[in-house]
């Protein structure tokens, strides 16, 4: 479910919990941190997994939990240690972005040597890695 609706979920009824969060403008949604903080006691009683989706992970040296800056920051801020972690690269869908978002993302891609053609969509997700993560979690 969306993070906005997750606060209504009774976590006690589940044996496994998976939380995923994407990066927008260099940050995870603050509600993800709030959710973890409020539910930390319950999360620590369960088998849990966390994954982050960010385009930085398109680079081989930043596509693992221990090398991805956003994962490292999430773990530091949240003070939560899920049983399983994963990092996925996601995609850039320039045509679907608003003008300002497209410019900002294009600039970020330019300075990080990523794709900058705003007429294109770029898929960086390693779907085999996603499927493997799902198998390991479930």
Language model features: what each stretch is:
Residues 1-7, 54:
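A short beta-strand-loop structural module common to alpha/beta enzyme folds
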Residues 14-16, 21-138:
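FMN-binding flavodoxin-like domain, especially the glycine-rich phosphate-binding loop
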């Amino acid at each position: 479910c969306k993070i906005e609706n997750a606060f209504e979920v009774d976590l006690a009824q589940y044996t496994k919990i998976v939380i995923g969060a994407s990066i927008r403008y260099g940050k995870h949604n603050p509600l993800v941190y709030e959710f973890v903080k409020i539910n930390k006691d319950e999360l620590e009683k369960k088998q849990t997994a966390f994954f982050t989706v960010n385009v930085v992970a398109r680079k081989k040296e930043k596509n693992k939990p221990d090398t991805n800056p956003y994962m490292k920051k999430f773990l530091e801020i949240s003070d939560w240690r899920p049983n399983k972690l994963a990092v996925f690269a996601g995609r850039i869908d320039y045509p679907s972005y608003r003008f300002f978002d497209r410019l900002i993302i294009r600039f970020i891609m330019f300075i990080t040597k990523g794709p900058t053609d705003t007429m294109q969509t770029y898929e960086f997700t390693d779907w085999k890695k996603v499927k493997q993560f799902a198998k390991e979690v479930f």
